[in-house]
């Protein structure tokens, strides 16, 4: 597993890996014990589009987190054209502390923190990293949710046509 720090350019890591899986941790500048975000990059044998999937914006939404972890196991980079970036748990603090909606370190909802701030709280830094480092690298960006502990959700989808 490699480790990259906040502000390191993800683009370089994406371009360096061909037909390879890279598991990395992005670290943020904070005193929070959960000051990191796991990222898996599956780079295909051939160049192609970059597809990003993020789960765990709300760390208590377990089904999407489990789904992307299973997906990572199923993908063979040698059979992939392009790159798949997966963030299985964007809000690590919320996941480990089992707190619905907010990060326990700063009590902020990551879903409402975008575009974030490089010098802000842990939640704002995570949002900023996703906004500045991950989204610009992505041809397709999918943020999946599953409903927190006290929610019942009806299936739906939303898509921007721009």
Give each language-model segment a name:
Residues 3-162:
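Structured catalytic-domain cores with a bias toward divalent-metal coordination
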